[in-house]
């Protein structure tokens, strides 16, 4: 049962370059993804005690070590110890490589993190809310609820979720409706436990900032926002990746950082940090390494860039 449950959250990863090659110009500039911008009002600040300055915290996703975790050369316990070596503020516990969701195992991870002064910035699963069949959507909702409980057991405040790719014959608007309905219910459950859900701009309908904003506003929960991966938006004729990052940064609940886009072009990380600073973002800037180098060499290099920029643009 444990293995079956963990398989539900592990998406089949598609290389970003392969996705763009296979999708072609129709996806990059098509009318469904390149939707007209909607007149969403700026996100109001309803928390008068909130400091009016950015607080950019350093982090790393367990996913950065996927090459090692996936073949059993690393454990989640070692990910926690790596966070100590890297000198970061927190680690995002990607759920794909948990040995189980048994309470004793989760308690052991939480205790190990505490003893080493490591904060869990969140957890992450891969269940997709874009499901045409009501029964499948109900199963996804139950899976999210289960992982809200796992997140609570870890003592983490945030859970990353996906919307997903468009099924054959479905429209973007149908997918948005399915996602809104599922995530409204999920946020109602998560909010009672103080857990915030962050929908990642990952593969499919959320690779366009306007779709992300529509979902966020329609879900309408203080316990919901965007787990913003800075390299996942597909540029359109109206908005490049940076414009879409700027549009969604005020709604970011957690941020995943890479230093290259899918086409291999370098990300202007300084420009990205300026965007988050202007948005008064308060949260983690977590390395999610996918480079060619072995993670033991590549992750520290990316983390060093993150540290330098957080020092430059953060109030902490």
Where are the predicted features?
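Receiver (REC) domain switch/active-site residues of two-component response regulators
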Residues: 89, 157, 253
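Conserved beta-strand positions in the central sheet of alpha/beta enzyme cores
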Residues: 92, 122-124, 160, 256, ...
């Amino acid at each position: 049962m444990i293995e079956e449950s963990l398989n539900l959250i592990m998406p089949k990863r598609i290389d970003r370059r392969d996705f763009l090659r296979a999708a072609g110009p129709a996806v990059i500039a098509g009318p469904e993804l390149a939707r007209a911008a909607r007149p969403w009002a700026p996100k109001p600040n309803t928390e008068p005690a909130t400091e009016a300055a950015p607080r950019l915290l350093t982090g790393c996703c367990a996913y950065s070590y996927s090459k090692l975790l996936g073949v059993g050369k690393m454990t989640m316990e070692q990910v926690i110890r790596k966070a100590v070596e890297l000198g970061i503020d927190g680690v995002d516990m990607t759920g794909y490589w948990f040995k189980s969701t048994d309470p004793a195992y989760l308690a052991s991870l939480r205790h190990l993190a505490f003893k080493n002064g490591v904060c869990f910035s969140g957890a992450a699963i891969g269940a997709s809310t874009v499901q045409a069949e009501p029964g499948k959507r109900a199963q996804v909702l139950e899976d999210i609820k289960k992982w809200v409980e796992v997140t609570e057991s870890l003592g983490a405040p945030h859970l990353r979720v996906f919307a997903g790719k468009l099924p054959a014959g479905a429209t973007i608007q149908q997918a948005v409706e399915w996602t809104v309905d599922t995530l409204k219910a999920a946020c109602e459950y998560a909010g009672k436990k103080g857990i915030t859900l962050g929908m990642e701009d990952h593969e499919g309908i959320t690779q366009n900032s306007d779709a992300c904003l529509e979902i966020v506003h329609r879900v309408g929960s203080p316990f919901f926002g965007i787990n913003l991966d800075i390299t996942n938006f597909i540029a359109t004729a109206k908005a490049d990746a940076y414009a879409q990052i700027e549009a969604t940064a005020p709604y970011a609940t957690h941020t995943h950082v890479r230093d290259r886009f899918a086409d291999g072009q370098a990300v202007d990380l300084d420009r990205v940090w300026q965007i988050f600073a202007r948005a008064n973002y308060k949260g983690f800037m977590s390395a999610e390494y996918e480079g060619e180098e072995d993670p033991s060499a590549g992750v520290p290099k990316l983390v060093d860039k993150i540290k330098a920029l957080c020092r430059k643009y953060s109030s902490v």
